[in-house]
Amino acid sequence: MKKDLHPEYKRTMASCACGNTLEVGSTRDEIKVEICSKCHPFFTGKQKLVDTAGRIDRFKKKYAGFDAAAAAKKK
């Protein structure tokens, strides 16, 4: 068998944007996540809008003209 074939698997801390930290096993030194089980709407029972960097606004802006263009095309 070859030696040093697999990466080192160690205990590391995963930190959430809400401030929660979890100890997990990984090959990385540090893990940062945007949402975890303490702040995710499915687990908390509260509905919350999660908009990362204005994705909803960009989507609405990108596709805003399609309804008008489709209506004009039908006429």
From Swiss-Prot:
GO CC, one annotated term: ribosome
SUPFAM superfamilies (alphabetical): L28p-like
Presence of the UniProt keyword RNA-binding in the record: yes
Cofactor: Zn(2+)
InterPro entries: Ribosomal_bL28/bL31-like_sf, Ribosomal_bL31, Ribosomal_bL31_A, Ribosomal_bL31_sf
GO molecular function terms noted in the UniProt entry: metal ion binding; rRNA binding; structural constituent of ribosome
Cofactor remark: Binds 1 zinc ion per subunit.
Gene Ontology BP, a term: translation
Residue ranges that the Swiss-Prot or TrEMBL entry lists as coiled coil: none
PROSITE patterns, per the entry: RIBOSOMAL_L31 (PS01143)
Transmembrane spans: none
Top-rank taxon, per record: Bacteria
Keywords on record: Metal-binding, Ribonucleoprotein, Ribosomal protein, RNA-binding, rRNA-binding, Zinc
Subunit description: Part of the 50S ribosomal subunit.
The protein's name: Large ribosomal subunit protein bL31
High-level lineage: Bacteria, Pseudomonadati, Thermodesulfobacteriota, Desulfobacteria, Desulfobacterales
